[in-house]
Design a protein with these regions (language model features):
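Inter-motif core of Ras-like GTPase G domains
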Residues: 155-176
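Phosphate-binding P-loop
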Residues: 25-31
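Walker A/P-loop phosphate-binding motif and the immediately C-terminal alpha-helix
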Residues: 32-70, 185, 191
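Residue-level signature of catalytic and energy-coupling elements of molecular machines
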Residues: 30, 41, 67, 75, ...
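C-terminal lobe/tail of nucleotide-utilizing enzymes
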Residues: 1-19, 185-273
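Phosphate-binding loop that captures ATP/GTP phosphates
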Residues: 62-63, 68-113, 125
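Glycine-rich phosphate-binding loops of nucleotide-dependent enzymes
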Residues: 104, 128, 147, 160, ...
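Phosphate-binding/switch loop-helix module in NTP-utilizing enzymes
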Residues: 110-158
Length: 273
């Protein structure tokens, strides 16, 4: 197919490619940007985003979350953030969680958090770009971008507009999900964005009575996907009702467990001492 010169919706490299990169405002400083993506919804991508931000914050890094899931935002709920966004001159001030994570989400701009966002793709992508350029991100070591599922307008906008240093791909054990995850991995490869690793959510369930592990959603294909693309497996999250309860109650910053440590170590390696 011939070139339409619409570079904003194209993932191919060519000599006539336009520069869609967006610059931060002069007040902001963000050292590293990590995208958290999934091929489909319902795999726990926002949970993983929250756990990554908290894990890095516990290591002493300054963290932020740009909630790019405009039509399905859940980050404010997970962190117990309710206050509306304020402005400082021409820039917006992100909300700050109990332990210091900066958060920008469309839910913090709506009159009611239950109000739907009924926008077309280009408008949604534009809003995500503004969350990068028009927010005062103060001295952030690691920003995590909670992407909407799939490979549509918003992931393309983020990959083209933001200086993404790498992505974490979230999946679950089901075979169909594994196939869709490969689409997300291949999109990142097409866009020359490094895939830092894979995280499998709902990997196994440990019976509280007998202590045996059960593969509730079937046998995992994670290792085969990782081997095919030469990507490390960074974490396997167990099914833990406590984690779901903490997401719902806004206390994700209080989670316990070391299952995210390999992922945190991989991300920390991006920032020289």
């Amino acid at each position: 197919m011939g070139c339409t010169h619409d570079c904003g919706s194209c993932s191919h490299d060519c000599s006539s490619e336009q520069d869609f990169s967006k610059k931060l405002n002069e007040m902001s400083k963000v050292k590293k940007v990590i995208g958290v993506v999934s091929g489909k919804g319902g795999v726990g991508k926002s949970l993983v985003t929250g756990l990554l931000a908290v894990s890095m914050q516990r290591l002493g890094y300054r963290t932020a979350i740009l909630d790019a899931d405009i039509t399905g935002p859940s980050i404010p709920q997970a962190f117990g953030v309710r206050e509306k966004i304020e402005t400082l001159g021409e820039v917006m001030l992100p909300a700050v969680s109990r332990f210091g994570t900066q958060i920008m989400s469309i839910n913090l701009l709506l009159p009611q958090e239950s109000d739907p966002v009924v926008w077309r793709g280009p408008v949604i992508a534009g809003a995500v770009g503004q969350f990068w350029t028009d927010v005062y991100w103060k001295d952030v070591d690691f920003m995590f971008v909670d992407m909407p599922p799939g490979t549509g307008d918003v992931p393309l906008t983020v990959f083209q507009s933001l200086p993404v240093d790498g992505i974490i791909v979230v999946t679950t054990p089901q075979q169909l999900v594994g196939m869709i995850v490969e689409k997300a991995v291949k999109m990142a490869e097409m866009m020359n964005v490094p895939v830092l690793g894979l995280v499998e959510n709902m990997s196994t369930y440990t019976c509280p009575d007998c202590g045996r592990q059960h593969a509730i959603f079937g046998e995992s294909r994670l290792d085969s996907i990782a081997a095919a693309h030469h990507i490390p497996v960074l974490a396997r999250l167990p099914i833990q009702p406590e984690l779901a309860a903490q997401m719902d109650s806004g206390t994700i910053e209080l989670f316990e467990g070391d299952f995210m440590q390999p992922a945190a170590d991989r991300i920390a390696a991006l920032l020289p001492c």
